[in-house]
Design a protein with these regions (language model features):
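Nucleotide-activated chemistry modules centered on ATP-dependent adenylation/adenylyltransferase
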Residues: 1-190
């Protein structure tokens, strides 16, 4: 976003936000601030779909579903007004685990794109599964030879540009560039 603004580029970025219904209020506030501050250069896909989400908080279920219509009385908060729901996605079905991968292909086709790159903001320091995503030895399908990319579908790739950032890198960048951030991290620091 900073690069687009500094170089006065005439491009828009699609932002895919999987709204999980149950999130910290500070996280929701941060997402809303970022969307509002950048609406001139981003197209927002705020998705409120009852996709399967793995959980270890139940002895009876291996997954839960945010925004499940049949459990609307139990929703933690109202659905955002600008949300896209399951009716917006012809590929959605209740059995799928790979919603975000299918979304990438859907947006590629919808935009009639030549190539699509989805930027994913994960850091390998945060979890072993994230580390495996980048360093898996059997990683055959990358964009050119960039190890921090993965092919999702024909001409659709995920890229992980901050995969090697450490926690200190994140805070150094925030301090240097005065980026907005989720103030929930201030509470974690205390």
């Amino acid at each position: 976003i900073d690069y687009i603004r500094r170089n006065n580029l005439n491009v828009r970025i699609g932002v895919f936000h999987m709204d999980y219904e149950i999130q910290y209020k500070m996280t929701i506030d941060y997402v809303d601030r970022m969307i509002e501050a950048n609406k001139d250069i981003i197209d927002v896909y705020r998705v409120c779909v009852p996709f399967r989400v793995a959980t270890c908080t139940s002895m009876y279920q291996s997954f839960w579903r945010p925004w499940e219509k049949g459990k609307k009385k139990l929703w933690v908060r109202p659905m955002p007004k600008d949300a896209m729901t399951e009716k917006d996605f012809p590929f959605y079905n209740t059995q799928m685990w790979d919603y975000q991968m299918r979304f990438a292909k859907w947006i590629h086709d919808k935009k009639d794109a030549v190539r699509t790159c989805c930027l994913i903001g994960i850091r390998t320091q945060e979890s072993f599964n994230r580390w495996r995503c980048i360093y898996l030895n059997r990683k055959y399908q990358m964009y050119h030879t960039y190890r921090w990319t993965s092919k999702v579908a024909n001409d659709v790739y995920n890229a992980y540009p901050i995969f090697d950032w450490k926690t200190t890198d994140v805070w150094t960048a925030n301090g240097k560039f005065h980026w907005d951030y989720n103030i929930l991290y201030d509470l974690y620091y205390r």
